[in-house]
Amino acid sequence: MSDTWYTPGTAALSNVLIVGDHASNHVPPGIELGIDQAVLDTHIGWDIGVAALAWALGAPAWLGHVSRLVIDLNREPGDAALVPLASDGHEIPGNAADTSDRISLYWQPYHDGLARHIALTAPAMLVSLHSFTPRLTTRPEEQRPWEVGVLYNRDERAPRLAIPRLEAAGIVTGDQQPYSGKLLNASMNRHAEAIGIPYLGLEVRQDLIDTEAGVARWAARLGPIIAEVCASIA
C-alpha cells in the first residue's frame, strides 16, 4: 500500500472501483531516470488529470503511485516496454541499467494489493481510467479528435452499454481509440476478465481534465453514465 493511493469514495459510486495505473508521475528516491522534471510533468510521465478525476467521481479508487517511466503498471513482466527505454521521442537513460528489482518493489505490491482489495470488496464493476495526449510529439500529423475513448478486450458488456450513452450525451467517443484494448489491457485482463468482473476502460483527453474546472465538468458528465452502466449490468 505504500506505493498506491486508495480512497474509499462516496456513496454515489460505491459499487464501482476505479483503477488508475498511471495516475502519478512520482519517482521514488534512489531512482535516477536521467530526464528533467519538465518531461515527467508531461503525458510521458503520467496520465494527466486521472487522479483528480477519480477523486471527483467519488468512487473508490486504486491508483498507482509511481511514474509509468519507473515501471508501467499496465504491462506484464516480460513485456519489453515494462520499463521503457524511450517514450514519445524522449530517451530514458536511467532505464538502461538493471531495473529488475522494480517488479518486486512496485509492480508486484500494486497488483497483489489490488487483487486482495477486489477479493475483499467484490466491486460490481471496475473502471480502468486513463488519459491521452491530444497530440504525440513523434506523430504530429495524427488527429485525436475523441474526447473519450472506450477500450476493451474480450469482455464487451460494459463498453456496449457505455458507448451509446456517451454518444447520446454529446461526447465525441472513440471505440477502441486512441488505443486498442486488444493490445493494451494488461491490468483489466488480470483483474477483471480473468475472474469475470465487468469493466469499463476509459481514456479521457488530457486537455479536457488538466484544470479543476475541467475535472469537475467531466466528473459531472461521466459519473451518471458510469453509474447507469454499472446498474444495467447488475
Predicted regions, residues:
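N-terminal catalytic or cofactor-binding beta/alpha core of small enzyme domains
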Residues: 1-234
